[in-house]
């Protein structure tokens, strides 16, 4: 299922995984200001991303379905402090983060996620959130497989976080849940799933570009 979604989302998926932002991260050449801008916007993104999983709990039809988005939401809420700590290491105070204005790319992407969650099924919501989870897992694998590990890469901690077995497993669980949700769907419903997945992938490209452009 996921292979088909990715294939049908080309060329956008490859542009997402191999974006210039990603390549500069891998080489350690990304300007510090670009990464700081990305980190601040990512915090704002994660707030709305968490809200999307809260909608997933609401959309669930039974306790079994509820468990996956509930677990993800709990992890996100626990780890947001780690994100704030990481931002502090990059010279970004909590006050600066809390007063940062959302970029146009962040608004477009997060409101699209929430719209899918508000108006669509649980499967449609997961079609919207899966490109983020799976994509970051694939980005980390792409970097580790195609670029040498540099001893002084300032972005190595970021790379290691998403290359970790824990994150890779969490991404796979998201994929597996989406696959299960899609099994009973008819061709028309699956076409909508594809459209959402592809659109969210395009939004991810725009988010990387926002970081590069300091937009």
Swiss-Prot record:
GO terms for molecular function: thiaminase activity. CDD domains: TenA_C_ScTHI20-like. InterPro entries: Haem_Oase-like_multi-hlx, Thiaminase-2/PQQC, Thiaminase_II, Thiamine_Salvage_TenA. One of its GO terms (cellular component) is cytosol. It comes from the Bacteria. GO terms for biological process: thiamine metabolic process. Belongs to the thiaminase-2 family. This is Uncharacterized protein HI_0358.
